[in-house]
Amino acid sequence: ELVKAKKIDASLLEGKNEKYLMTVVSAPLNGVNEALVIAGSDKRGTIYGIYELSEQIGVSPWYDWADVPVMPRQNLSMMRGSYTAGEPAVKYRGIFLNDEAPCLTGWVKHTYGTNYGDHRFYARVFELILRLRGNFMWPAMWGWSFYADDPENSKTAHEMGIIMGTSHHEPMARNHQEWVRKRSEYGAWDYASNQQVIDRFFREGMERAADTEDLITIGMRGDGDTPMGGKEGEDDKYVPRDEENMRLMEKIFRNQRHIIKEVTGKAPEKR
């Protein structure tokens, strides 16, 4: 309605990515003489505008995680006009919760009583990322499974506007713990000898992620984040097979791209 009434210039937002516009508008609604309006080109754009205002009035993005005090204010004022930070220069901006044990896992256990990161924990991380104008995260992976531990995790990411991905060791939107916990059923994490089962594992991941913004990692590592063909804890016994592994990796790439296209109906590079 504000756009139709020409109180907001839609051309400043149309076709833009994650851009917000903060502007003072006269008579935006009946009975309202003047208002500060925050509009976004998309969901994250609007979120960034809200958090920009929050930061401008004295709420640090680190108010929660670093206990930065929020200073009380009796009055707030804003100059009339429009303000925007423009579009982000980098498309994906986020963090990887790496080497999370024992510090972070212990804190989560103490705070939430769980042996995994649930949606309550991740919501606090997501808020920090958004307040820092980020949009992306790789979840912790040592003993946790973002997708399997709490079905609300992925839903919370979507609702809050966070794009999820997975690390170098977790291809096709699957957490390695999902394999580890069913190793007796699935068999070896070895594409050369167990391709059919692994392809099904990959396909299930894509089916689960098909309607999300998740950024899909492709490729494959050895079991336990070892080189292809290696075994966890036995790095000293590993014998490099570079040529063989490169041929196998090329096959994995082809098959993963085929699965992505088949499940989503989109070219892999456009997923």
List PLM regions with ranges.
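Hydrophobic faces of well-ordered beta-strands that scaffold small-molecule active sites
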Residues: 93-97, 130, 136-139, 164-167, ...
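Second-shell loop/turn segments in exported
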Residues: 35-40, 81, 111-116, 141, ...
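Amphipathic alpha-helical packing elements
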Residues: 34-54, 122-147, 154-157
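Gly/Pro-rich turn-and-neighbor structural signature
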Residues: 69-79, 142, 148-159, 183-271
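Trp/Phe/Arg-rich N-terminal binding region typifying the photolyase-homology
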Residues: 97, 113, 123, 127, ...
